[in-house]
Structure formats: C-alpha cells, structure tokens
C-alpha cells in the first residue's frame, strides 16, 4: 500500500449540554463527587479522550450499517448487501488484532485510516473561565424516584463539563493509493450521527449533546448540517 496523503480534520467541538465521561476513579471521598469526569493527571483539567470519540462514532456507523454485533465488526461480518460499508468501516477504524494478516481481505483493507486525538479546552474557553473565575466542571445532583410514593431517594452527584464548553477537535485520515472518497463521506456521516446522538454517559437523560463548528477537511470547509447520514 502506498501512502498518498494525510488529511487533517479539524473543528471546534462545542458542548450543547453537560458532558460526563467517567474517570474510573474508585476512590471514595466523604462529601465528594460520586462520579468524576476524566481529567489530565498533571493539569487536572477535563478533556475528551480520543478513544471515547472513536468508539462512539464507530458504534454509530456500525448501527447504521445494519450489521452491529455484541463486539466491533470484524472480517467475518463482510457479507451480504452491506459488505462494502462494513469494509469501509474497517478501513477507517481498523481490523481486530487477532485477524489473520495473511488473509486476502485483510490485506485489501489494510491499516486503520483514522487517528483520533484527545480534545483539550480551546484557549479562548480557558481564558473565559479564568476571567470569570468559573470552574471547569459542575456537579449535577440526581435522585432515584420511588414509583409508588413519588419520593426521591439515593441522591448522588455526577460531575459534568458544562454546556458551552469548547474543545479543539482534530483527527487525521491517511489516504492510500486506490482509497475511495467514500471514506471521507463515511467519516462525515459518523460525525453527523454523533451530533444527532450523544457522547459520554447518560445520553438518554440529556447529557452529551455536541456540535462541530468551523469544521474543515484539509483546506475545505464542511457544514455537517448538510450531511444526511441516512442517505
């Protein structure tokens, strides 16, 4: 495979509602947050892991393909009327590590084209927080409602990055000889699906609505609102 180009996809990722991506911290603090967001261990600033973006976008595209399984799609799922879309998903996100590298279809698909990066706060958002003496996160109080008595119980605090926060979004797309433009189209559909769905935890409760602003693919501006992921 001959590498012909590496395209940068950039945008400002804006939170339309609060975002919670957990840190996995099992340490308990009396009076503290029950569910903390992931933070940079050095700066203690929250960020969006590239792995979270990659996993959610891939999952949405797999659902769109109609071939979704309990595990990520693999070589064995390339069949039927959606075979080419499954191939393109594997081209973008990669095949599993246990795939037979000598199998012809694995060689045809090649290496993963996408490279996701962690998203940090934009400089202007950091400046806004500093100038207004605002916290980078908020505590969202939630309860479980007793269906019989209608009383609230089991109170808990979930840490969120508040609506309005802005992040620098960037990924790279490796373009190899004979790669189809359909790969870029599929990626854009994945980004649009993410806008229509949610990122992180508690999406069914309104968390994690995001929007990609000032999106560019290489030197070309793209309006995701014009992308129909179901076409």
Feature map (PLM): residue ranges:
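RNA-binding basic/glycine-rich loop and surface signature characteristic of RAMP-family CRISPR effectors
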Residues: 1-140, 154-231
């Amino acid at each position: 495979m001959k590498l012909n180009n590496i395209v940068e996809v950039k945008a400002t990722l804006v939170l339309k509602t609060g975002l919670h991506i957990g840190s996995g911290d099992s340490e308990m603090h009396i009076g503290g947050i029950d569910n903390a967001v992931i933070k940079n261990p050095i700066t203690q600033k929250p960020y969006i892991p590239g792995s979270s973006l990659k996993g959610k976008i891939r999952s949405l595209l797999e659902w769109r393909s109609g071939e979704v399984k309990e595990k990520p799609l693999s070589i064995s799922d390339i069949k039927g009327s959606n075979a080419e879309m499954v191939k393109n998903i594997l081209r973008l996100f990669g095949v599993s590590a246990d795939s037979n590298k000598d199998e012809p279809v694995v060689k045809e698909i090649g290496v993963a084209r996408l490279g996701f990066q962690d998203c940090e706060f934009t400089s202007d958002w950091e400046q806004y927080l500093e100038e207004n003496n605002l916290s980078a996160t908020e505590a969202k109080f939630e309860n479980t409602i007793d269906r019989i008595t209608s009383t609230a119980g089991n109170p808990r605090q979930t840490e969120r990055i508040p609506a309005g926060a802005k992040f620098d979004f960037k990924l790279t797309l490796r373009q190899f000889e004979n790669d189809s433009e359909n790969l870029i189209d599929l990626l854009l559909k994945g980004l649009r699906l993410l806008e229509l769905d949610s990122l992180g935890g508690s999406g069914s409760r309104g968390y994690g609505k995001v929007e990609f602003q000032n999106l560019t693919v290489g030197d070309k501006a793209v309006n995701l609102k014009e992308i129909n992921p179901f076409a």
